[in-house]
């Protein structure tokens, strides 16, 4: 079920006038014909997979950091108890 996809691009910078011919020749007028819906779906899936993987890695890193902080608190408490008992 391939559908037509309309994409609008907004450029948020002013190109250097001397580079406009090069930009035009590298992009050309047929930029809208370079991708079909199948390619857009495939590329989107890859992007979504990368985003999901990065999210999972961030959650795991946060959990590891929390576990290390808890270990540090326990170690500090144990050292404090040992110090109190050594008096």
Curated annotation (Swiss-Prot):
GO biological process terms held by the UniProt record: B cell activation; DNA biosynthetic process; mitochondrion organization; positive regulation of immunoglobulin production; positive regulation of interleukin-17 production; positive regulation of non-canonical NF-kappaB signal transduction; positive regulation of phosphatidylinositol 3-kinase/protein kinase B signal transduction; positive regulation of smooth muscle cell proliferation
InterPro entries, A to Z: Prohibitin
Nucleotide-binding recorded as keyword: no
PTM annotation (Phosphotyrosine): residues: 83
Keywords: Acetylation, Cell membrane, Cytoplasm, DNA synthesis, Membrane, Mitochondrion, Mitochondrion inner membrane, Nucleus, Phosphoprotein
A GO-annotated cellular component: mitochondrial inner membrane
Residues where N6-acetyllysine is found: 62
Source organism, top-level taxon: Eukaryota
Known role: Protein with pleiotropic attributes mediated in a cell-compartment- and tissue-specific manner, which include the plasma membrane-associated cell signaling functions, mitochondrial chaperone, and transcriptional co-regulator of transcription factors in the nucleus. Plays a role in adipose tissue and glucose homeostasis in a sex-specific manner. Contributes to pulmonary vascular remodeling by accelerating proliferation of pulmonary arterial smooth muscle cells. In the mitochondria, together with PHB2, forms large ring complexes (prohibitin complexes) in the inner mitochondrial membrane (IMM) and functions as a chaperone protein that stabilizes mitochondrial respiratory enzymes and maintains mitochondrial integrity in the IMM, which is required for mitochondrial morphogenesis, neuronal survival, and normal lifespan. The prohibitin complex, with DNAJC19, regulates cardiolipin remodeling and the protein turnover of OMA1 in a cardiolipin-binding manner. Regulates mitochondrial respiration activity playing a role in cellular aging.
Family: Belongs to the prohibitin family.
The protein's name in its UniProt record: Prohibitin 1
